[in-house]
Amino acid sequence: MVAAAEITQANEVQVKSTGLCTDFGSSGSDPLNWVRAAKAMEGSHFEEVKAMVDSYFGAKEISIEGKSLTISDVAAVARRSQVKVKLDAAAAKSRVEESSNWVLTQMTKGTDTYGVTTGFGATSHRRTNQGAELQKELIRFLNAGVLGKCPENVLSEDTTRAAMLVRTNTLLQGYSGVRWDILETVEKLLNAWLTPKLPLRGTITASGDLVPLSYIAGLLTGRPNSRVRSRDGIEMSGAEALKKVGLEKPFELQPKEGLAIVNGTSVGAALASIVCFDANVLALLSEVISAMFCEVMNGKPEFTDPLTHKLKHHPGQMEAAAIMEYVLDGSSYMKHAAKLHEMNPLQKPKQDRYGLRTSPQWLGPQVEIIRSATHMIEREINSVNDNPVIDVARDKALHGGNFQGTPIGVSMDNLRLSISAIGKLMFAQFSELVNDYYNGGLPSNLSGGPNPSLDYGLKGAEIAMASYTSELLYLANPVTSHVQSAEQHNQDVNSLGLVSARKSAEAIDILKLMLSTYLTALCQAVDLRHLEENMLATVKQIVSQVAKKTLSTGLNGELLPGRFCEKDLLQVVDNEHVFSYIDDPCNASYPLTQKLRNILVEHAFKNAEGEKDPNTSIFNKIPVFEAELKAQLEPQVSLARESYDKGTSPLPDRIQECRSYPLYEFVRNQLGTKLLSGTRTISPGEVIEVVYDAISEDKVIVPLFKCLDGWKGTLAHSEINNLPRSPLYNDCYDLSPRMLLLMLLFSDPEFDWS
């Protein structure tokens, strides 16, 4: 048996270090790539996603040589027409040609090699010396998918482009025995945006994605059933597409070439790459809008305190909390909420509900899983994943199973579970936001109109969110547990990588629907808080004026006992949620009128002697006060509402003083949406659709990162890192935070207990 060191030395010409976990010849200190895999996770998730999107938007040409392709490269080539692909001939051409020539040489020698002189799979006992005909037959029998007339049966264009890129990247490593000219033709097809139609279904991603990849081979060989789409949707035959890139005659596949093209995990890995790109962005978005949820709910930002999360040790949780803490730091909403809680500490529970308070603990593990899946897929798209592997250096073909796409199936199952968990949290927060029992004074359903009896706001959207959540949670079920034995029990275990990636892509799309609905609701809540604040100011002003006019002074300017009522009356206004009465502010059955009257009655009882005199009686003033209040308040409330609708409210919108403002500004100004109201014809779905399209087109990424401008990727309070530690610290993971903190304090002899 050849020693590992000899293998490394023999292959060092073919493999170079890339910084990813893709080296064949790892250093002696890291022979199994565990250290390299761990180092790839260094730094924050935020920094990783930022680098990813910077690369995605900044890419103009993607140069590939087999070992340094990234998730963002795949997404950019798949989605952005201005991005071109270039094969790195200097790095890869010689090794590609060497492996191709090796196959032909061995064929001439009569060497028995799987897929070159043998049958396939369970029928590999058959033999032939007609190598070219064997490859032709391979492509013919693998063209077993169904395209049909229904577009739903065809793999999406961006996934197919990604698959062409990933497959080419794999073949560039020179272990597959395929000609350089074939890879160059795929490059030209990509750059001309000529995309073959591949069947959506029919692969188990072991032995690779045989069926869909055979349709790429069908294009290259000009099979009569090959169909190709141009960028503008024109359909043509494979032969016509090849002529458009300068190939007058389709390829006649040489021995091994057909097998090299089809026997790999590239379709599943390609779609998984796109899924990972989206999942990372959406995870970050969910963290920021969870902070925005805290703002509009007048929440308590204490849940982001760094010590709480440092004591839990999980990096994903710590980062999620740190991001939320940064967004909330200095927020005008949080300053206002602190005053509200101080003024009336019993108005809401001591602690916020789990959907907000434990959002870092909930989102953190999802971020860790998504990061892990992303790195696993990035290793896969830089792997050699066909069979046999041509080892030119040792003059042999290695028969193995790198076509098994288990990394794709497993990582996509895990990622999809995390996507569903994020969606579940978004639904929990949304449900709290639209429920007037929990949302801190916002109207039921976030109704934006003046008449709640004719405005049901986001009631339909909440029903839709329940539907999305149910479907998303259904999709959370694993795909890989449903493996069926295939191909005469030769492929008795298989990864279902592409199937799992497809289900994950569905989950991503549903999460986009949920986030667009939720972001619409958050912007609605921001507008309602602005309206609430201006309405409250109007009501307080009128109540104060009416109290002074009717209760404070007599006809001759003398001071009356009722002058002491004003402060308590204004306290009632402060404590009463504006939207509980503002549609009819003087309605006798509404809480504001009742509580104002109660204040006057209480003062009347205290004014015992004064009640005997009609001029100083507070009881006698109640009808006068209420009549004057009705006369002034109703028209002033209407004027305040009119002023708000025109955008001329006197009080500024607090959101402008918040780090979450870029998202709000994006939805309202850049996308041109407005407050939803029953008085307007536009429906919630029309606004949500605009936001959904913007998220799907990656337009939300720029404002998302603006929310985090200046964040250094660390916890806010550096002193947390310098807490005194007990020698028992490392054994205290199971203790409560309070007990652990006490132990830390006792361990410091210089701690000042005064």
Curated annotation (Swiss-Prot):
Contains an active site 4-methylidene-imidazol-5-one (MIO), which is formed autocatalytically by cyclization and dehydration of residues Ala-Ser-Gly. The active site is at 114 (proton donor/acceptor). The gene is PAL. There is a cross-link at residues 206-208 (5-imidazolinone (Ala-Gly)). This is a key enzyme of plant metabolism catalyzing the first reaction in the biosynthesis from L-phenylalanine of a wide variety of natural products based on the phenylpropane skeleton. This is Phenylalanine ammonia-lyase. GO terms for cellular component: cytoplasm. SUPFAM superfamilies: L-aspartase-like (SSF48557). GO terms for molecular function: phenylalanine ammonia-lyase activity. One of its GO terms (biological process) is cinnamic acid biosynthetic process. Keywords: Cytoplasm, Lyase, Phenylalanine catabolism, Phenylpropanoid metabolism. It is an enzyme of class 4 (lyase). Its EC number is 4.3.1.24. The keyword NADP does not apply. It catalyses: L-phenylalanine = (E)-cinnamate + NH4(+). (E)-cinnamate binds at residues 263, 351, 357, 387, 459, 487, 490. Belongs to the PAL/histidase family. It comes from the Eukaryota. It comes from Pinus taeda.
